[in-house]
Amino acid sequence: GDVYKRQKQQEGDTVNRIDLTQAEWQLMEKLWDHAPQTGRELTEAMAAQTGWNRSTTLTLLRRLMEKGAVRCDAQGRKNVFYPAVRREDAAAQQTRDLLGRVYKGSLSMLVSEMTKREALPQREIDELHALLQEMEERKHHD
């Protein structure tokens, strides 16, 4: 996960593309769940959760700020960190990337692969069915 940002046209909107490594995701999850947090709060929480030392967490925070995923405000002598991207937006981007990279953009291939290996609970089957019906109805109204 090298640092890179590019402008991307997505359904008519220009969005900043932010690629996150697995470690950066862990730190972002902590911020999405509890924001804002001080540098000390984050380094202590990540040490307890992952065993990372202080400099590892601070390096990840710096990289996340460079990528535009995290904002930092100075409050007195403390730095306070906030997520600058919504979890939903980051997850949607990662999902589109996976779909394009692994399944050539085919959602049906992804669903097929995921359901071949293990049985889906009836609740999830019902949710997928409802989503497909909703998409079909929207298609006929457009």
Please name every model-derived segment.
Residues 6-30, 104:
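Short alpha-helical segments that sit at the start of domains
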Residues 85-111:
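Conserved segment of winged-helix/HTH DNA-binding domains
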Residues 68:
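Glycine-centered, phosphate/nucleic-acid-interacting loop/turn motifs that mediate DNA/RNA or nucleotide
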Residues 37-45:
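Short acidic, hydrophobic short linear motifs in intrinsically disordered regions
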Residues 44-53:
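Short helix-coil junctions and helix-kink-helix linkers
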Residues 6-14, 116-142:
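C-terminal regulatory/oligomerization modules of transcriptional regulators
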Residues 1-4:
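Short, small-residue-biased leader/transition segments that mark boundaries at the very start
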Residues 17-23, 75-93:
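Short, cationic-aromatic polyanion-contact patches
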